[in-house]
Amino acid sequence: MPEFSDEAHDAKREMRIALLAARRSLSAADRAVAAAAVQAELVTLVRRLRPARMSAYVPVASEPGGDDLPDVLRAALPPDAELLLPVLRDDLDLDWAPYTGPESLRAAGRGLREPTAPPRGRAAVAGAALVVVPAVAVDRRGLRLGRGGGSYDRALARVPATVPTVALLHDGELVEAVPTLPHDRPVHCVITPADGLVAVPGVGPGASAGRTRGS
């Protein structure tokens, strides 16, 4: 692996450790206020776009959005719409299964909660009209810092360039730049509690960190 890749990995790890520590320092009350603000902005977006299918995730621990996010989204979607949630595979790629209510979730590895319905396959996310992903940080180019497994980079690579992709953040996690590797995939927008929906169009839709707009 080239030396610059090792440096990027180290820089990512250091940034991730610092930001996750800041998340853990938030009080339960602060997390609840932030979750409510993020949910309200996302619900507004869902009601405006009215997607027939969207994908999201179940926030855990200090992740933005609150652990009731799937129920909030399901209530905001059109009655016949489908909400897909991720199922982590052994190879750290993501499969997708429909969410039908709290009783359709089970505890999974790494502290995750996943749907119990039969998975639809890794490519199911490509049929979503709105994709919501977690992130530890996102920069002004739209490039995200995740947990380090590459799961969502692989998922985002399957999403058509025209589909809106949104990362949920705490305040202070939309940053000027995150360390990147060529496989890193951007998002179109972020939602933060204070700023709401923010477009981050510095990387062309469908691009990776190795191909930025104008290059």
Identify the residue ranges that each predicted region occupies.
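N-terminal active-site beta-alpha-beta segment that forms phosphate/nucleotide-binding
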Residues: 2-126
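Conserved phosphate- and dinucleotide-binding cores of soluble alpha/beta proteins
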Residues: 2-5, 92-215
